[in-house]
Amino acid sequence: MSMFCFQCQEAARNKGCTVRGVCGKTGDVANLQDLLVYLLKGISIYAEKAKELGVVDRETGAFITRALFTTITNVNFDNKRFEEIIKEAFEVRDRIKNKFLKAYREKNGEEFDEKLPGMATWYSNDVSDFYAKGEEVGVLSTGDEDVRALRELLTYGLKGIAAYAEHAYILEEEDQEIYSFLQEGLVATTDNTLSADELTALVMKCGEVAVKTMALLDQANTSNYGHPEPTQVNLGVRNRPGILVSGHDLKDLEELLEQTEGKGVDVYTHGEMLPANAYPAFKKYDHFVGNYGNAWWQQKEEFEKFNGPILMTTNCLVPPKDSYRDRVYTTNVVGFSGVKHIRDRKPGEQKDFSPVIEHALKCDPPEELENGMIPVGFAHNAVMSVADKVVEAVKQGKIKRFVVMAGCDGRHRSRDYYTNVARNLPEDAVILTAGCAKYRYNKLNLGDIDGIPRILDAGQCNDSYSLVVIAQKLAEVFGVDDINELPISYDIAWYEQKAVAVLLALLYLGVKGIRLGPSLPAFLSPNVVKVLVDKFDIKPIGEVEEDVKAIMAGE
């Protein structure tokens, strides 16, 4: 079965994956994901119509959010799980459809008889039809490449928002306006009457809602676990069995730490879970050791050497090797065929991590990969607490430039660019980072400026919000109206759809001159790229030395 997917930075030949995803997903899974997104658009059509009649269904919004998250790169590779979610999508669509029809009947005194597009009506109880239909309704079903580019840019931004909204929801923070925009955006991708300008306006609104969603998640994280504090994180290991926690879900980490306390098992973070070491709430656990390994794409070698079980709370999962597959556990929206899955928590209860803990007790301690310490925890609250010191260093010329190098890491050798930029920036430049892009340079010894580390790590990719807050506060302190007048440059690395949401957030806030790499998105047509270049001065990365000179010159 053929497929077409170009949603991530590693799309084959920077055009698209057509046989199997570079990420490892099969054509079957890709087509099921396309069908699921198609059905979410149908659900959204009814949700939007119901909203016009004053009917708002929170459960529908929550389902769309969670389902969109499953389609993000490196989240779920399990076709059986997608079959079940698609069946659930039919049920959700019927429920919101019936609520709408009832409200319409009550208001108008007649039945609704408007013809709706296929995503609002198509149904089959034959699973084999799911695969054929998915192949039919993929991204190439939109013929005009510019319309397709704008629709997919919007869709991928929506996926990123959905991921952040789902994390907030798990921590009991939600916002109906976010759910409503996800529905509005999905419906817009089905509307053939929308002009390119109207779609572009929705893309910018997507950036606005991305800021709102990251702020909501920041509130959820900090209200539950405290504000991150500057913290030195241990990179070594202890001589006890361990559990490695990867992904982004702090609630899972919290419950695992509680359930492992006093059990003789250590807990380590991996990848995007590294920033958890900076939250005050987790520092009380003596068996919370530190961080093991690097960015997601190196996990095959690192998971093999960890020896104990690995808990994947969200992306990024790489198809596991046979040598350690039996030690991988997925939870939440993550899935892989044949890998053990920890079920969602019941209301008022914790997840049951006992299978993971029992497994760990039978395993050898981790093999040490490295040792030493790295600093984390420089989110907006921590940086603003020393704002006077930062401002003084800028005024005295000790800090000439802040360089935002947030985003994602990936496999491409071209990403060495970011390591070399960090190495070549002069000693009066400070790097602001968030997301796993940090692993390209966070272990370099770049020193500090008057006690301010030259790499300030704000946290996970969603903590790019902290970088926005820091920039806005600096603008306030320096009395500038335009954020682009600050001594801040942006050299962003992207990989998946959450990075698209972060990029759109920056564009909405008016940031110009962003360098985006290691390649421009395959899903953008030449005309859409031209619009982004003309309006926002987005540029591809170049040679390291030339880029560093330009960055320091504010270009």
UniProtKB/Swiss-Prot annotation:
Gene Ontology CC annotation, any one: cytoplasm
Keyword Signal: no
GO BP term (any one): response to hydrogen peroxide
Annotated residues for binding of hybrid [4Fe-2O-2S] cluster: H248, E272, C316, C408, C436, C461, E496, K498
Gene3D superfamilies (alphabetical): 1.20.1270.20, 3.40.50.2030
Organism superkingdom: Bacteria
Cofactor(s) essential for the protein: [4Fe-4S] cluster; hybrid [4Fe-2O-2S] cluster
Cofactor note: Binds 1 [4Fe-4S] cluster.
GO molecular function: 4 iron, 4 sulfur cluster binding; hydroxylamine reductase activity; metal ion binding; peroxidase activity
Modified residues annotated as Cysteine persulfide in this record: C408
Binding site for [4Fe-4S] cluster: C5, C8, C17, C23
Entry's EC annotation: 1.7.99.1
Function comment: Catalyzes the reduction of hydroxylamine to form NH(3) and H(2)O.
Name of this protein: Hydroxylamine reductase
